[in-house]
Amino acid sequence: MKSLAGHVVKYGKHRERKSFARISEVLELPNLIEIQTDSYQWFLDEGLREMFEDILPIDDFNGNLSLEFVDYELKEPKYTVAEARAHDANYSAPLHVTLRLTNRETGEIKAQEVFFGDFPLMTEQGTFIINGAERVIVSQLVRSPGVYFHGKVDKNGKEGFGSTVIPNRGAWLEMETDAKDISYVRIDRTRKIPLTVLVRALGFGSDDTIFEIFGDSETLRNTVEKDLHKNASDSRTEEGLKDVYERLRPGEPKTADSSRNLLNARFFDPKRYDLANVGRYKVNKKLDLKTRLLNLTLAETLVDPETGEIIVEKGTVLTHQVMETLAPFIDNGLNSVTYYPSEDGVVTDPMTVQVIKVFSPKDPEREVNVIGNGYPESAVKTVRPADIIASMSYFLNLMEGIGNVDDIDHLGNRRIRSVGELLQNQFRIGLARMERVVRERMSIQDTETLTPQQLINIRPVVASIKEFFGSSQLSQFMDQTNPLGELTHKRRLSALGPGGLTRDRAGYEVRDVHYSHYGRMCPIETPEGPNIGLINSLSSYAKVNKFGFIETPYRRVDRETGRVTDQIDYLTADIEDHYIVAQANSPLNEDGTFAQDVVMARAQSENLEVSIDKVDYMDVSPKQVVAVATACIPFLENDDSNRALMGANMQRQAVPLINPQAPWVGTGMEYKSAHDSGAALLCKHDGVVEFVDASEIRVRRDNGALDKYAVTKFRRSNSGTSYNQRPIVHLGEKVEKGDTLADGPSMEQGEMALGQNVLVGFMTWEGYNYEDAIIMSRRLVKDDVYTSIHIEEYESEARDTKLGPEEITREIPNVGEDALKDLDEMGIIRIGAEVQDGDLLVGKVTPKGVTELSAEERLLHAIFGEKAREVRDTSLRVPHGGGGIVHDVKIFTREAGDELSPGVNMLVRVYIVQKRKIHEGDKMAGRHGNKGVVSRIMPEEDMPFLPDGTPIDIMLNPLGVPSRMNIGQVLELHLGMAARQLGIHVATPVFDGASDEDVWETVREAGMASDAKTILYDGRTGEPFDGRVSVGVMYMIKLAHMVDDKLHARSIGPYSLVTQQPLGGKAQFGGQRFGEMEVWALEAYGAAYTLQEILTYKSDDVVGRVKTYEAIVKGEPIPKPGVPESFRVLVKELQSLGLDMRVLDIKDSEIELRDMDDEDDDLITVDALTKFAEQQTAKELEKKAAEQVEDERQDIIQNFETAEDNLD
């Protein structure tokens, strides 16, 4: 194959990279969010209709009225996406359903369109807007319905088998053997009953029939012996039915009729039992005779029923070739046998199965019946007697060594429930609840005047949809830290959630990597911690088929010519098991044949060297194994998988920076991942850019129409980062459909740009980079290299209270004029104001309760309009660490037509923007799991510098590399340096990237030293360091764990109600817990006073802390502490147990523990002091007012006297 190392590849219109890939891409990556969009589209097109057709028609109890489904339609949405965001509304469209009500008595038919509630719509980005917030519905990975067989070992070490028929919804049917070789069944986890009892209940009551169907076997004989109703020829169906009923409903009177009804309802009623399409497909596939008979020896001659010709002789071994001949005959019902159940059985229809006799592998003399279920059509969604009999046959065959047990962790047995199906299931619940209401209304209301509208109550349907989007475990607030986080969230697969696993019950096997994950689920990207292995990510090329199984693409190998064709087949895991697949990097000749006679290939869980004539398929790309985030790690093949996992996860936490920079060393995935993430602004039609500015782009289509694109500016993302788009097209540029018009956050020239390319040296420096710490140059702070913008939202509601409405106002009690300087006349902060912690954002007062006014107060009120009623200041203030610049203010009122919650009259939202430079304590990381905390930011002049005088930007500890085995970072460092010297961007795709030779060759080309190291000089002394140092360009990202969000100090804050100790945590403005061990430390030091005040004043001595406050205010010595509140709580607890507890001092005299309410009246509390201050202020105001009144009175008297004098 021709060497492609170092060819130039174009990514989008604006970026070229030198790619080191040797394998040419045969298949484009699919649209990365199609798992969301396609599934939802299926729901709108087919899923909804399926639902209505399942539940309707609804007949009343007499069969007179019937409500039928005609059609449905989604009308225009009420709000656009942007309006829904702004109004805190849902982005949804009204669903209207046309229903027909038929009265069979009168023959009257009424058709009517009924409103079925607003249905949330998916945005183009694959998200939903619920209450103004973007949410993602995560796809769920669940066990597929079907029939499963497993081996089990009992406590004595005896091997046995078990089997389970799992429906999509309905009762489970389990089979198992015990130590005595007797087979039992359990229905829906109840007590076990002998297998033959269920067969009798189905209508095959006599022993002869049972042996005729299943053939003779030791297990069956033991089971019949155990069966209480054994009788060779008489049918014992009725006894079987009663037996089953007794096990299912112990204690109730057993009759054959009630048992018949119960079994019918459990298994054969489509409303209660549903295998779904996928369940029927899996059952037919598992019970398929073609796979079960493979490599067995026939015990009968098979004859074509139509012509009488012999197809296969008795004694023939059924190899692949023989089975190919036999397959069409089996499909056409070869050896079908019809059994007629007795009239008193559960089933009355005849049962047709296919029975083929083979010799037992364990005893070649004995014949064994292998029974197939006769392939029911996919429309049959319930389990049928033929399925039960065929699965029992499979179960009995397993003991003869025929058939295989299933691996439940294999992806052939696990399927994806995407948005569409999850919504459909939820909608079904709502419709089923509605159905009950409709039936009741049909029987109550007057049939003459009845219309479909009167029958339908949409409340249960609306509620179930609302519940799903609002509170389901799978409906998640979208991770919007950066576009990669957004994309990964939409491609996430969770094994948790309703109908899935729980964290506590999930063992190692479920979480582990399985060979069937290859090309379907990423083996690397999964969270660390309790969810490891339960939350996964879809591989880059994987798709989900109509049954919900994950498929991965392979190139077909033409067996005859040995050529690898460009024909792509998408295979599910269970189908892939039958083939041998070569790796994507197997060398090929010009004509597409393999260049070597032997290639590395996979056959199920084995990695083998296989001769090329046995190969069926070949991988399409080396990156089909991994997920998108993992495929963004260059030199992934040189990293340990644990570190790669951290690298993949940490890229999702990268904070968007002010000036994003795409990596010099990329993998070629940067463009595709940014393009499909939903953060970029994409062109919808071919055309020419006619107008472009920061807020709008207009494209004139080729057909003359004009498309307008709004560019989002500085919107708050779900994660509090800035969501900002920047146009990258220019006036007059020709654009095509799908081109990137504007970069989103963390994007540059259409590529994902999560961090910055910085000059990194691997060296220690005065111990400041001990334990993965990072030393950084002040240049990165000064030039805003790692500066990010954060927008926080604060809101204040004015509600109706019992004492009157709250008011948003500028007039706030006891607040000086300087605190109100940035508030407008309504009391709301102005846009652009710079605010600090504790500043007012929205002035608000709440009524305290109206007291009777005295005569003076009434006079005051009459003169000055002073507020007579007492109000409390409940203004919105900037919380600790929330200072910044007011970016936007939104006001919602009922008058303006905004929908507000009940009891809310006005809602004000204030957005504060912060510009955060990088800081000591911030967390940073590379792409290889090499994370650390910034420990010191040094002046540029003190940083070590290169021989040409360039100071380096970051120093990393070289000890972070060997034990962690993420060597990829060192290769990235060297290649990055070479790329920067050459002025080119490079791409090194995963598992097909630059080899060591490529790296060294590029290093030589760039004119660097052969070891890629350099001498560094100490910035303080100018002396060279002893050894040569690896210096290069590495891509480093700033993570969302910023010290500004974590730093916290308490001054005076809230106390817990019962123990009166300070609360904990930053959110509660709490204190630091001084625990048991910390107390020991102070005891060890003998720091008695410190210890005393920590256990009393600073904790829960309520009286003491108030007196201490008072003493500090008055400048007096601090008094002795009292009894801590937690001690009183203990005493009260013991008293509540009926123990007479008393507290004595050293002199044995009793200390009186008074309740807090009984404290001396002269005890001053903080509240009391505040109230005292308020009263003083009020008195001052009163005094001033009185003086003013007196002055005015004197003025009036003076004026009178003057007037009198003038008259005289």
Curated annotation (Swiss-Prot):
Q: Name one Pfam family in it.
A: RNA_pol_Rpb2_45
Spell out the protein name for this chain.
DNA-directed RNA polymerase subunit beta
The GO cellular component terms are: DNA-directed RNA polymerase complex
Coiled-coil residue windows: none
Which UniProt keywords are present, listed alphabetically?
A: DNA-directed RNA polymerase, Nucleotidyltransferase, Transcription, Transferase
User: Which terms does the record give in the GO molecular function aspect?
Assistant: DNA binding; DNA-directed RNA polymerase activity; ribonucleoside binding
State the CDD domains in the record: RNA_pol_B_RPB2 (cd00653)
The top EC class is: transferase
Give the protein family.
Belongs to the RNA polymerase beta chain family.
Q: What does this protein do?
A: DNA-dependent RNA polymerase catalyzes the transcription of DNA into RNA using the four ribonucleoside triphosphates as substrates.
Query: Known EC number(s)?
Result: 2.7.7.6
| Subunit-level organization | The RNAP catalytic core consists of 2 alpha, 1 beta, 1 beta' and 1 omega subunit. When a sigma factor is associated with the core the holoenzyme is formed, which can initiate transcription.
Note the PANTHER family from the entry: DNA-DIRECTED RNA POLYMERASE I SUBUNIT 2 (PTHR20856)
InterPro entries from the UniProt entry: DNA-dir_RNA_pol_bsu_ext_1_sf, DNA-dir_RNA_pol_bsu_external_1, DNA-dir_RNA_pol_su2, DNA-dir_RNAP_su2_dom, DNA-dir_RNAP_su2_hyb_sf, RNA_pol_bsu_bac, RNA_pol_bsu_CS, RNA_pol_bsu_protrusion
Q: Which reaction does it catalyse?
A: RNA(n) + a ribonucleoside 5'-triphosphate = RNA(n+1) + diphosphate
- Name the GO terms of the biological process aspect: DNA-templated transcription
Supply the source organism for this entry: Enterococcus faecium
